[in-house]
Amino acid sequence: NPYAHYTTTGPEIWQQTGGRISHFVSSMGTTGTITGVSRFLREQAKPVSIIGLQPEEGSSIPGIRRWPAEYMPGIFNASLVDQVLDIHQRDAENTMRALAVREGIFCGVSSGGAVAGAIRVANENPGAVVVAIICDRGDRYLSTGVFGEESYAQGAGI
């Protein structure tokens, strides 16, 4: 997984941004994406801030884990990550729904978390070129109620 992101995702991000990327924001599930992409970006001439995302204490975001240090996956290299942000489940879900309604991107909760984190980083760094990856699909969450009547009744559904 890290090798695939090192050889494909990292170079694609570099190419698509014309090397202008200043911040890479990635959810930390298996940590393959953040490990592979950050390794590639660190090898480029320009410094890029690498930011990992984990659920806030007490939040549950499918696909993103709050790893205790002793249980971090063996592929993870902490020296490649500059900062770890906590994301609240509500923010991840709200961003996921906003992406569906405003942008037509039907993604899942972990992608909502990644984009919520990227928006936070962009707001704190005007003019920055911030990249996040949409890493899951919304159809996997249809039965959970995050898009449905329960959420809508609480003012959050679409």
Regions inferred by a protein language model and the residue ranges of each:
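Active-site/ligand-binding-proximal alpha/beta "capping" segment
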Residues: 1-29, 90-106
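A short, charged, Gly/Pro-tolerant segment at domain boundaries
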Residues: 132-143, 147-149
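Predominant activation on well-ordered alpha-helical scaffold segments within soluble catalytic domains
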Residues: 7-14, 35-38, 42, 61-65, ...
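Short glycine/serine/threonine-rich phosphate/pyrophosphate-binding segments
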Residues: 3, 27-38, 110-118, 141
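Glycine-rich beta-alpha junction loops
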Residues: 29-32, 54-59, 68, 113, ...
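Conserved active-site loop/cleft motifs that coordinate metal ions or position small ligands
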Residues: 106-109, 129-134
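Active-site/ligand-binding loops adjacent to catalytic centers
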Residues: 20, 41-109, 123-124, 145-158
